[in-house]
């Protein structure tokens, strides 16, 4: 077994899932040509193209809303929010739309997405870059 850093393992997992299922796509700020803030998506834009590795504007609620719509439409999006501290603007959509879609529609719709968000940061940055409020999310899913 190869020794991989966490970022290398994430990159490899994304490649494997994208090769296995053409419904899987990535979206987030700077994840395309730049390879993401931690370089977890490095090389994926070149490998899978702009339709499956989508650079978005800096708009977390837009990233989440788009991912939810894609998921409900049959795709398997993997949205990335650069830092957990920036997830606040998307919190309503994540908890009130995605998490409750199956119950709200009596099983007619689901929201199969994987949200990627670095937590804790590890970079000792100021506000919004080193938050670790995971407990908020573990207590909001329905």
Annotate the PLM regions.
Residues 1-142:
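Thiamine diphosphate
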């Amino acid at each position: 077994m190869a020794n991989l850093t966490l970022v290398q393992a994430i990159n490899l997992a994304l490649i494997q899932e994208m090769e296995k299922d053409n419904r899987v796509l990535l979206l987030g700020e700077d994840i395309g040509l730049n390879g993401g803030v931690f370089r977890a998506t490095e090389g994926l834009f070149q490998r899978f193209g702009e339709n499956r590795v989508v650079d978005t504007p800096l708009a977390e609620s837009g990233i989440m809303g788009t991912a939810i719509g894609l998921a409900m439409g049959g795709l398997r999006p993997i949205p990335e929010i650069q830092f957990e501290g920036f997830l606040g603007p998307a919190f309503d959509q994540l908890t009130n739309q995605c998490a409750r879609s199956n119950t709200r529609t009596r099983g007619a719709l689901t929201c199969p997405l994987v949200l990627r968000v670095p937590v804790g940061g590890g970079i000792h940055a100021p506000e919004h870059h080193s938050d670790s409020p995971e407990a908020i999310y573990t207590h909001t899913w329905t």
